[in-house]
Amino acid sequence: MPGKKAPNGEFAGRKLKLKRKKFRWSDIRYKRRVLRLKEKSDPLEGAPQARGIVLEKIAVEAKQPNSGMRKAVRVQLIKNGKVVTAFCPGDGAIKFIDEHDEVIIEGIGGPKGGSMGDIPGIRYKVVKVNRVSLKELVKGRKEKPRR
């Protein structure tokens, strides 16, 4: 008669726990969390926001069934030099952003840290331009500082 796989005594708790630990590595979510793979591959390095310099303005075509050009900017992050694309939310918001401006970007809020709605492949959005809120600039409450 073959031996049993798991101990089942009064003091077998530690052994059962160690045995369970081995199998957790086959769970992808556990593995990614423990090895901190998201932070390692994330351009923001796990931070909620990041500062960067605008390299160029671009227009991205919306996904089907929508049509239109979504205005975005290519931003080089100051902390690690990585280049990411960030969406400019708001009507005419792109007009307040020029090349070589300093912007603050954050996640766009899509599912699982991905892109949002009909904007393909863009995971970040611009929040501030030269330390002034982009929302305030678009609404006309504040003016962009002249350098």
Swiss-Prot record:
Record keyword Cytoplasm present: no
Keywords recorded for this protein, A-Z: Ribonucleoprotein, Ribosomal protein, RNA-binding, rRNA-binding
InterPro entries: NA-bd_OB-fold (IPR012340), Ribosomal_uS12 (IPR006032), Ribosomal_uS12_arc (IPR022863), Ribosomal_uS12_euk/arc (IPR005680)
Annotated GO CC locations: small ribosomal subunit
Gene3D superfamilies associated with the record: Nucleic acid-binding proteins (2.40.50.140)
One annotated GO biological process: translation
Function: With S4 and S5 plays an important role in translational accuracy. Located at the interface of the 30S and 50S subunits.
Quaternary structure, from the entry: Part of the 30S ribosomal subunit.
Entries under PANTHER family matching the protein: 30S RIBOSOMAL PROTEIN S12 FAMILY MEMBER (PTHR11652)
HAMAP family, per the entry: Ribosomal_uS12_A
The name this protein goes by in its record: Small ribosomal subunit protein uS12
